[in-house]
Every structure is written in C-alpha cells, then in structure tokens.
C-alpha cells in the first residue's frame, strides 16, 4: 500500500544534532555525523575550548568545521535561591552556564558566547523566557 505524505517535508534530510561535551567520543561523533552540536551549561571559556576540540576532530576526519552549527544551553537565575529552586542538587554543576546579574551583565555574557562561536542559545528554566525578553 502506498500512502501520500502531504505536505512534503521542507528539508531534504532530517538534521542530526549531537548534544554533550565529551571530548574523546561525543565531539568525535559530532565531527563525523552532526549537522548541529549543543553543549549544556558551560562557561564561555569552556565553550571555546570544546568548540576548538570539535574543530580539531572535524579536521581529523576531513570535514569543514563550519558545517556544524554550534549551540549552548544556558539558564537564567535572578538569585541564588532561584538557581537552587530550578536545579536543586545540580545547581553547582550547571552554575557555569547560568546567566546572572544585571541585564547588562547578562548581555555581556551572551556576547562572550557569541565571540566563542555560539550561533544559538537554548534558554533553560522557568525564568528564562521572561529574562531573555527583558535583556
């Protein structure tokens, strides 16, 4: 039996996204197969480092590093209490990727990720949408 699929997909292929920051396996797999890469809750400095590792893996497999869209998960917390309530026991682990401070400080921090090569940001936590809109 043949069935029609209408409307047709916009994309010719489904993009493959790889998430994580493991430098030996995850980033190597991303270099080989990913259309996009996302790393959660890292500092701008760690994003720079992991992005460089991904670039190195791409070069090792003969792939143009610019073929992979690079993104980062970030959270926004107004206060330490907000961070704790959003993430509980994980608060310290995600802290490097949490935007805090004034709107100007948040914008500056986002600029650091942009300078490091982040093309998209994924806001995490219930306060993210409000704070993104305000900043």
Spans of model-derived segments:
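Active-site-adjacent structural elements that line small-molecule/cofactor binding pockets in enzymes
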Residues: 1-135
